[in-house]
């Protein structure tokens, strides 16, 4: 079944360009265009598209207000277009709070090294959102997400997982023979027995859907959380400072954008800067972060694989690593190294993911002990960390 798309933008050029790109994909079809948020709300109710692409700054009604109204009345997956500025980052985070599921920079040259890559990325994001479940927006305090049925007839299949090296594989499918032996069925937090391990760090890696998921989890942590927390969220460099500031204002724990040389301390979360790689090194009892540009051929900056791999060397078996919602397979190879070192790996379950790519890759590879609903992830982490 074709994924039907509503394009919303006050720029006639951008409406036309996005429509052309969408219609180039045989799996996608533009069924309507709107020039402002008010039109978008009306057309969303009438046309019932599978996905909406939405600008933020528009006359009559802005994109954030439109997202709130659509998600309150006719929940539909929404992909925001944003400028890579401080104000653009804040507005995009507001849109995600309101219920939008993902975002892309409005300037295509900001998201790709060439035209073909930009086209592929936009089409891929729309396909993934059109195939997934949608959720009512979380409140700023992290209220429970409410699942809604996906469109009938839309396939949720993904490409088969292939071989990869750290941070380079975008594949996100499943191998059926492996999945039969993997913990992909959701485990309630109440059924998880604390292992009693003395962890040195909590690591959380995520991509699409991650900002809302991280907010939901971290706002439930007490200021006395006993371990440092390393957060790896696929996000442009212009966005991570605003995201760290937002989380810090909402959470009892401290949240900051990671800086080179930061000494890790309990009860503090360090967000990997966009466009950089975050690694951890340990000398005696002191653990510090290294924040570097890294190799130019890496698909992800920051990369979950890179941070996980460094933690496996620094902390051996003393890591609790969690892979949340996200497109691709980043985190799988780093999780493999952590697993080999004896660390504990968990994944978010399929039903609560915006995109079940990264957690699926880890679960299907047999690396995760449990797949856990986003609603219960904080409870499970706190229990395992000795705070439950």
From Swiss-Prot:
EC number: 3.1.1.61, 3.5.1.44
Biased composition (Polar residues): 174-189
Region described as Disordered: 149-190
Record protein name field: Protein-glutamate methylesterase/protein-glutamine glutaminase 1
Domain called CheB-type methylesterase: residue spans: 188-388
Subcellular location: Cytoplasm
InterPro entries assigned: CheB-like, CheB_C, CheY-like_superfamily, Sig_transdc_resp-reg_Me-estase, Sig_transdc_resp-reg_receiver
Taxonomic source organism: Shewanella denitrificans (strain OS217 / ATCC BAA-1090 / DSM 15013)
